Every structure is written in C-alpha cells, then in structure tokens.
From Swiss-Prot:
GO terms for molecular function: ATP binding; dethiobiotin synthase activity; magnesium ion binding. One of its GO terms (biological process) is biotin biosynthetic process. Catalyzes a mechanistically unusual reaction, the ATP-dependent insertion of CO2 between the N7 and N8 nitrogen atoms of 7,8-diaminopelargonic acid (DAPA, also called 7,8-diammoniononanoate) to form a ureido ring. Its main location: cytoplasm. The keyword Ligase applies. This is ATP-dependent dethiobiotin synthetase BioD.
Length: 231
C-alpha cells in the first residue's frame, strides 16, 4: 500500500488528467486504486468536480472529496469568503490513511501549486505530504516559463525534505515548438529530476476506454513499472 501526491507548478497544468492517467495505469496493472481531492474550488454543490473527471477517464470509483467551495480561489480564501468550514490537515491525513488501508495505491491531488493554502492554519500540500510521508509527482507545463516554475517547485519539495518521484508534462502539444523541445531536454538538467511522462494535449477529451488503453504509454515504462512494483 502506498500514497503518491500529485502537485503542479501552477493551476491548469494538467494535474487532474495526470492523476487519472496514473490511476488508469495502476488499474491496468491490477492494482486497487483510490483518489483523494482534499479541496475542490470553483464548482457549485452537486456539480461535477475534478474527481468526476478522474472517474470518467480512469474508471476508479473510490474517490473522496473532503471540502468544496463555489468560488474559483485558493481553498482557504474560498472557505473564508463562503463562510464554510476550513479543511483541517489532520482530517485529510486520517482520510488518506484510511483509504491506504484498503487500496494498493492512493493518489492525492492537490489544488493549484505546491504552496497554495488548503485550509486551517495555512497548511499546504507540503504539510500534508510530510504528514503522510509521501513522495510527490510534479505536473509541469511544456512551454516557456516551465524551467523556472518546475525548479522552484522541486526546490520547495527538497527544502521540506520531501522526495520528488518525477516530473510529468501535463499537456504535450501535437506539434511542439522550439521551447517545448528544449524544455524536455533541459528540465532534468535544471531540476535534477527526470521527466517520467508526457500526456498528449487533449487526452482529457478521450472516451474512457481509449484513455485507459493509452494511459500507461504516456509514462516511461521503466519508471512506471518500478513505481507500481514498489507498492
């Protein structure tokens, strides 16, 4: 049983699709998978959030969302403005550990970037990962700016004593330009962490069967096998 945190260099870099791809690849390998999204923002009560997309794409139905706020803001800001209770780190830890007891793999998808405040006492995904003793996968953009953003994120993980399991490009264009091609080579050099996967742009629009059949091919096969066989 193992826990893997999925964070990103910013918002809208493809965390949800990468989470779904990891879940689908693990399912294909015969593992039982659960996914936790501690805080969902920008979605009204009853509306489909990120976990609905994870389920649609990967087929994983063991999904847990702990808090939801209607405004598209950082979770602690959204909680204050809505008057709804703030998420507590201890509650998230308890939930994830309970999921871990019954599944081979638990994926925990963050909100926004690594240091976004998630709830009470300003806790972040760093605090959560440390409490869970879990490594993180960093989802990064492909284009200009990603070298700086990704290195900052990985340095923050390292400074907190947390392991980075790899970098995944969340949306790799059909026709990558010069910047994208150079970034693919330069990211490992500047961060010290391998790029272990690239999800093709538009993959989130695939039907479930097509997504599930392709998901494992988007990751480095040696990395994926090593990651899943350690569970």
């Amino acid at each position: 049983m193992s826990i893997l945190v999925v964070t990103g260099t910013s918002t809208d870099v493809g965390k949800t699709v990468v989470t779904a791809a990891l879940a689908a690849a693990a399912r294909e390998a015969g593992l039982s998978v659960a996914v936790c999204k501690p805080a969902q923002t920008g979605v009204a009560p009853g509306g489909p959030g990120d976990l609905a997309e994870v389920t649609r794409l990967s087929g994983v139905t063991a999904v847990v969302e702990l808090a939801r706020y209607p405004e598209p803001l950082a979770p602690d800001t959204a909680a204050r403005r809505s008057g709804l209770p703030m998420l507590r780190c201890a509650d998230v830890v308890e939930t994830v550990r309970a999921l871990d007891d019954g599944h081979d793999l638990v994926l925990v998808e963050g909100a926004g970037g690594l240091l976004v405040r998630l709830g009470a006492e300003g806790f972040t995904l760093v605090d959560l990962a440390r409490a869970l003793d879990a490594p993180a996968v960093v989802v990064a953009a492909a284009g200009l700016g990603t070298l700086n953003h990704t290195e900052l994120t990985i340095r923050a993980l390292s400074a907190a004593g947390l392991a980075c399991a790899g970098t995944v490009i969340g949306s790799w264009p059909d026709e990558p330009g010069l910047a994208e091609r150079c970034n693919l080579d330069d990211l490992p050099a500047v961060t010290g962490v391998d790029v272990v996967g690239s999800v093709p742009a538009g993959s989130g629009r695939l039907a479930s069967a097509s997504f599930g059949a392709a998901a494992s091919t988007w990751f480095d096969s040696t990395w994926l096998k090593s990651t899943l066989t350690r569970l």
